[in-house]
Structure formats: C-alpha cells, structure tokens
C-alpha cells in the first residue's frame, strides 16, 4: 500500500472527529437536559462525588465525548460550565493523539473546579488546555471499589465515566476546551 493511501486511512478518524461536532450538536435546551442527567448519573454511580460537587466553585459537564482512532485518534464533545448549578457558558472539548489505537467509544466527562481561582483562570482563557494551562486530577476507583482520595486536594478534579461507572486508562491530558455559542 502506498504512503498516500496509508496516510488517507490514518486521517479518516481525524475527519470523522472534525465532522462529528456538526452531527452531534445539540440545542441549548437539549444540552442543558443532558448535562443535568449526566451529573445525576455520576452522583448515582459514585456517591463520593456528591460532596465534591457540592463544594465545587464550578462544574464543567460533557454528557457525551466521542473518541475514535485508527493510528491517529481524537475526541470531541459539547458541554456546559455550571456555576451554582446554572449554565453560564457552553464549551467544546477536543483532543488529538498519535499511537497504537483502533476503534471508538463514548464517555461522559465532569470537571470540578474546587477553588474560585481555578475557575476564574479557566473562564478567562481562550482555549484552555489540560496539562498546559492547568492540571486535572483524574479520580479513579481504588482496590476496595472506593474512590482513590489522594487526588481530592487538587484545585481541579475530573471524572471520566460510562454507563458502568468510572472508566480506566483514560486521561484529560491534551484535551482542549473552547467556548462555543448555543442557540
């Protein structure tokens, strides 16, 4: 197989990721409902998240983040930032990756800004990137099925989960968050 043909096969997932936002774009009302349902689902699956959510200065919720890869990979999703449980701004998350990866999956992502300062820096940015503009401490499940609490003192805490609860082997590193306008 020639290099251009191989390259085009590797770029197909990237094209799908770039096209997906127009396909999955939800109205403001639809997205607000999905955000609310996602937050409820997290609290049902992970009871320890309830107290963290109550203490958070802001909550960034992405109900559905689509990830796909075939050599090159990427992810995208739409969500909103809640302050006092009210949507104040809508966002898109995107990431690109290179490496051995084939397939796709959907997950939900919730980012908790535990301090006013962390929330303010996020809101003032134009294209905030995890691992560059701030670090998101990913919450995982420990040996006994309980949330690993060693990351709970971080100013920004994140959850990545599916229908069965928290997901493993995933990360926020390289994810970029962009403000979007919703009608």
Residue ranges and their predicted role:
Residues 8-18:
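Bacterial N-terminal signal peptides
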Residues 1-5:
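N-terminal secretory signal peptides that target proteins for export/translocation
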Residues 20-22:
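N-terminal signal peptide c-region/cleavage motif recognized by signal peptidases
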Residues 25-183:
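Small-residue-enriched, tightly packed secondary-structure blocks
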């Amino acid at each position: 197989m020639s290099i251009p043909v191989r390259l085009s096969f590797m770029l197909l997932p990237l094209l799908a990721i770039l096209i997906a936002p127009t396909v999955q774009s939800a109205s403001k009302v639809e997205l607000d409902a999905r955000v609310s349902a996602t937050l409820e689902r997290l609290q049902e699956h992970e009871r320890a998240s309830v107290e963290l959510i109550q203490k958070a200065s802001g909550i960034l919720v992405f109900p559905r983040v689509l990830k796909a890869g075939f050599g090159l990979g990427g992810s995208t999703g739409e969500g909103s930032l809640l302050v006092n449980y009210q949507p104040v701004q809508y966002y898109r998350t995107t990431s690109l990756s290179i490496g051995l990866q084939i397939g796709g999956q959907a997950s939900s992502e919730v980012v908790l800004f535990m301090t006013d300062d962390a929330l303010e820096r996020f809101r003032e940015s134009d294209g905030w990137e995890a691992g560059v503009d701030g670090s998101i401490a990913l919450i995982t499940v420990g040996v006994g099925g309980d949330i690993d609490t060693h990351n709970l003192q971080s100013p920004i805490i994140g959850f990545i989960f599916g229908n069965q609860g928290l997901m493993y082997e995933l990360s926020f590193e390289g994810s970029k968050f962009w403000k979007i306008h919703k009608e």
